[in-house]
Amino acid sequence: MKKVFIFLLFPFTLAAQQADILIKNGKILDGTGNSWYYGDIAIQNGKIVGIGRSIKFTATKTIDATGLIVAPGFNDVHTHIEGEEKRQPTADNFIYDGVTSVVTGNCGGSQVNMANYFSMLDSLHLSINVASLIGHNDVRKTAMGSANRDPTEEEMKKMEAIVEQAMKDGAVGLSTGLIYIPGTYSKTEEVVRLAKVASAYHGVYASHMRDEGDSVTQDIEEAMHIGRESKMPVEISHFKLSGQQNWGRSKITVPMIIKAREEGFDVTIDQYPYTASSTSLSTLLPDWVLADGQDSIKARLAKPEIRKQVIKC
């Protein structure tokens, strides 16, 4: 006699899990490069605990995202927030634009003591995440003031020590502002030596180049040379062409970046989406005015005949 087994199948549903926040019906862009899709996102204790089309959650707060895009927070890699942290710890200007993480210390300007800087940030309970580069200009000022000369070996070692300590304390790389005083007085090899220190701690090299106008191609090459010599990724800041005489040269500069990347070199660029810029007055002065440091600059500009020549330039 054969035994017959009868299985009774009963329909059942899984109980919905509890979350603090449930974002429903949004177009989800997850940041991986995949196409968007409709779905829900469940958040518990500040962390995503469910994401997808058919997740089962109830929540204390439900947000209807119909017709809206839901995405991870954006990273702004060029911000110059130094000095604003205490005035606006809520960082509304970033949050309202969907930016949740920023990089500061760009263009060679940063706090030199990173341990103190990060401790200050922690005490403010900022609403955004902050990473900082260590700025070459401030490192150089600390070691040798605004002198228009090469550093002595002792000064060079002091700069290297400052960069190393900054990287140990959490800096994410080295930035330069080679158009600004005193960075404009430095030679390429000086920057290479400091970049090698940051590279040992897996940092990135971010460059505000010496010039973004007539000599832009050679300055792009300098930025990439520094990266290659130090074996670190390069980020070229606010990639652009200054001066009407240079309009259209992006047909040359953009392929330079593409070619380097195709060859396996890690170089990236950032760009602001408008046709204005903000910088210091010194960048508009000719090299012969900037020679020999700030005291000499002030003395020259105090002379009426010099000011007339500068206006003509």
Enumerate the predicted regions with their spans.
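Cationic-aromatic interfacial patches
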Residues: 224, 232-236
